[in-house]
Amino acid sequence: PVNPVDKATKRLFYKHVEGMLELGEGQRREELIPMLDYLMRHDRSMCMCLAQILPTANEAWFRYTMGWMLPPNMTFLKGTRPEAERENTIRRQVWQEFAFPAERFAEMVRRAHEELEIYPLLAYPCKVIDRGGIVRLPGNHGRPYSGKPETAAFLDLGIYGIPGRIRDGDAYFDTVTRVRRIEARVRELGGFLHTYCDVFSTEAEFREMFDHSHWEDMRRKYEAAGSFPTIYEKVKPELDPLAFLEEEESWSRDASLGSPSGRRCRPGLRRAGRRGDW
């Protein structure tokens, strides 16, 4: 059968896939999905995050009466949210997507589970083509381009949602610290993060992940330094996640000592700015 999965009245795609588990072991189902619907299959669900904003989005009554309004306009949502809500999306939720060599997939899924316990995960294969640009294959950073494109099989892992311990009521879960640990491992593997998600790296760490050689050549050639922002300055969050590291470290110290004395303030209840402003 042909299944136009992006139709407003249809179940959100990840829920449709989840429903395949009900077929039973050894059962299979084949469908034909129009190309555009397939390419846009995660748009209505906002990569599985819509349930956090609109819990009724997958209910039949909502899909048939108001499903035509999905997905919400992301520019509008981002432009109208207050600072406290922006802090909440950094400290109490995760919006991350990484690409890394395919052979490391099992390791990274295990790490995502140990650090965050967020499901479902978004996973799909991708081909990385090294043409000497900002995305290079492991080991090629800073090396002159040979003129011959190199390719490698990578896997993409999207982690979108609320960490398990936060759902269970943990008010002192060190989300930023844990995401940074995952970022660090991705860098070690020669992978990279998708910059439409929140970037928790420092600028030095970001430059390890992406090859800036040609970009720096162009900056020098056109004397752009000081006139235009760096790539990192363009993509980093407007609210600095690194500003929360010291507080999260204090939670870990207090937990190891078995004392809550240093837990001065719960996340989301104070105004936080960039480092040095608190």
What are these regions (language model features)?
Residues 1-177:
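C-terminal substrate-recognition/cap domain of FAD-linked oxidoreductases
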Residues 75-84, 89, 147-150, 166, ...:
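Activity-critical C-terminal alpha-helical subdomain
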